[in-house]
Regions:
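Sec-dependent N-terminal signal peptides
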Residues: 5-13
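Catalytic cores of secreted/periplasmic lytic hydrolases that degrade extracellular macromolecules
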Residues: 19-164, 168, 172-306
Length: 306
């Protein structure tokens, strides 16, 4: 009896190892990040294309490695850049799809009942504000308009688009705006001292480069811009047509409908070349798979997990 009680006592002390569904990585250097990637066998064709499974591990980096810019091998550095961003793009699209499903559920209730609960109306108003859906209509006409517009605006952004735009705006993660401000898309803010002061770009001192708490926040805001700004109406309209045809959303299909005010010459040409050369449409077809990180990290690597 005593032995049984003793065994039970020690069993209670030993906590079972529960496989993580995601890994959030904090400050880290390149060597340790690559050790984590290697431990979870996160390497594929060209190092970053996870084929033929099309599965990516939910390993989410909050920042680029401290010594990322010191990687002298451009091929290796660009591959690591893609490996860092790919899981984040898939995470972001899962988040957007969750929002979309919430709107679709409200739309179905509205279709069936011709009315909505106060909570559902509040959710619609919140989403309409977030995605810049404006109307002076009232009552059910207002709700129908909001639903129709939100179902066009709230949808995934091809991962290849998010990765390439970040690569071109930050010179593949080597720009100071990444290290100093976690900025992937060089978003500007005006008439404020908050943010990074531009260096060698202009004599205009009225704007700053927006900074973020982590690189995911930068990506999240950029996707919201694509899904809400009037500048991207044509992009969203064509995306909606693709969805209606039940065709896979690929960056190569959508890229011609994107226009950025970028100082880079031949931005569209650079965009299409980069997409094709790095075969990033493969990531557009991929998903996150938490089974890939089922093993517990060694103790020496666990300290980098947030």
């Amino acid at each position: 009896m005593f032995v049984r009680l003793l065994c039970l006592f020690f069993c209670l002390l030993i906590k079972p190892v529960i496989a993580a569904e995601t890994l959030e990585i904090g400050k880290i250097n390149t060597q340790k990040l690559e050790e984590i990637f290697s431990f979870y066998q996160y390497h594929g064709e060209k190092d970053y294309l996870m084929i033929p499974e099309y599965n990516y591990p939910p390993i989410f980096c909050n920042y680029f490695p401290d010594d990322f810019t010191k990687i002298t091998d451009e091929k290796k550095r660009n591959a690591l850049f893609i490996k860092i961003l790919a899981p984040l793009t898939l995470k972001l699209n899962n988040q957007i799809l969750s929002e979309r499903n919430e709107i679709k559920s409200i739309a179905q209730d509205f279709k069936n009942q011709k009315t909505l609960s106060p909570k559902q109306i509040s959710i619609l108003e919140e989403k309409a504000k977030k995605y810049d859906v404006f109307t002076r209509l009232q009552g059910t006409y207002r709700q129908q308009y909001q639903i129709d517009e939100l179902l066009i605006k709230v949808h995934v952004v091809a991962p290849s688009i998010l990765i390439i735009a970040a690569a071109l705006e930050t010179n593949w993660g080597t720009s100071r705006i990444v290290k100093e401000g976690n900025s992937l898309y060089k978003t500007l803010v005006w008439h404020t001292d908050e943010g990074l002061k531009p260096i060698g770009e202009t004599e205009d001192d009225t704007y700053r480069i927006k900074t973020y708490p982590n690189i995911y926040a930068s990506m999240e805001e950029f996707a919201l811009k694509l899904n809400s700004s009037i500048s991207f109406d044509n992009f969203r309209g064509f995306r909606h047509q693709v969805i209606e045809r039940k065709t896979l959303l690929l960056g190569s299909t959508l890229a011609p409908y994107l226009v950025w005010n970028s100082p880079l010459k031949n931005y569209a040409g650079l965009f299409e070349y980069t997409l094709s050369y790095y075969e990033l449409n493969i990531i557009d077809k991929s998903i996150l798979n938490s089974k890939m990180i089922a093993k517990e990290l060694p103790q020496n690597l666990q300290k980098f997990i947030m």
